Structures are given as C-alpha cells and as structure tokens.
Amino acid sequence: VLTGQSVQSIFQGNDYWKVETNHETFSCQKLIMTTGSNPKIWEMLSEIGHSIVSPVPSLFTFNIKDNRIAALMGISAFANVKVKNTKLEASGPLLITHWGMSGPGILRLSAWGAKILAEKKYQFTIQVNWLNDSTFEETLDLLKDLKLEHSKKIISKKSPFEFPNRLWESLT
C-alpha cells in the first residue's frame, strides 16, 4: 500500500498498462482501478475508452413520513423487507428511528438497490413482514386461530409473536 501518491496519467499499451503517479511510474499486465468518486480519474479512464456509470448514494436509511411508526421510535425487531414492484428483498434486524427505518436489512436494500431506488427518485413503497418467513395467508390463518383460542382476551395486551409488545400494540 502506497500513500501520498496521486495518479497523473494512465496509458494502455497492447499487453500492458502504465500508471504514472506524482512520485513514480508503474507498469503491469493487468490493472484494477478503484477510483471512488474521483472525477479526475474518471476523466482519465474516459480518455482511454472506458465509460463511467453515474454514481448514486448507497448505504442509507429509509426516510418514512408515516404517523403509524412515529410512536415506535427505538423499536428493533427482525423483519423481512421488500421494495414493492422490484425484486429487492432483505431480512435482518430492523430499527425504527426518528425519521424512518434503518438496520442491516434496510442498509442492504439501499446498497444492492442503489440504482433502482435512485431511478425511482427515492419514492417507493416497502412491505415489512414482521413474521419473516410466513406468507400473508399463513399469517392470516395464524391470527384467525389466535382469535378463536383467545376470544375473551384483549389481543393488544400481549404479543403472541417474538417481537416487542409496543410493536404488537401498534399493529393491533
């Protein structure tokens, strides 16, 4: 690893590459460039025939303006999250924050779906499955069974599932 070096030029020969920095010149047969967001390097690569895909933000939380989750700030629970009308889906701990949702699953969606979400101008609908692997129909059947078994109880008082009671109270 070399530090304090700045790429000055890139040359592509028939079977080699030459990279000139502010301190020395390197030659190699194969070259991998990790440019980050350096427009100077992008321009150099464009000059030798490469195209640069416009960068978009990645690894971001979802800003959700919805009163239904406002009272749930601080709750964390495992969930499966889908971005509707796409193939984007991820599971993991989901954290409800003061301005939306975060956590490993959300960050994974924002990373793998960065281009798709940017194309949607960050306006999209998510579907959160708090029961992870259960389908809608399976969940509905389970809730009907619980209703029959506990018909005389107030269902909002105790969650029959493995997630926080405050979340259950909000859902009921």
How should each PLM-predicted stretch be described?
Residues 20, 82-172:
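Residue-level recognition of phosphate/Mg2+-coordinating polar/acidic sites
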Residues 3, 25, 77-87:
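Short, basic, helix/turn surface patches
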Residues 10-12, 62-64, 100, 114:
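Short secondary-structure boundary/hinge segments and terminal tails
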Residues 3-16:
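A conserved short coil-to-beta-strand element within the FAD-binding core of flavoproteins
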Residues 40-41, 46-81:
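Central beta-strand plus flanking loop segment that forms part of the substrate or channel wall
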Residues 7, 19, 24-38, 44-46, ...:
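Short hydrophobic core segments
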Residues 3-5, 21, 54-56:
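Short loop/edge segments at beta-strand edges and connector loops
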Residues 9, 38-40, 103, 113:
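Glycine-rich nucleotide phosphate-binding loop and flanking beta-alpha elements
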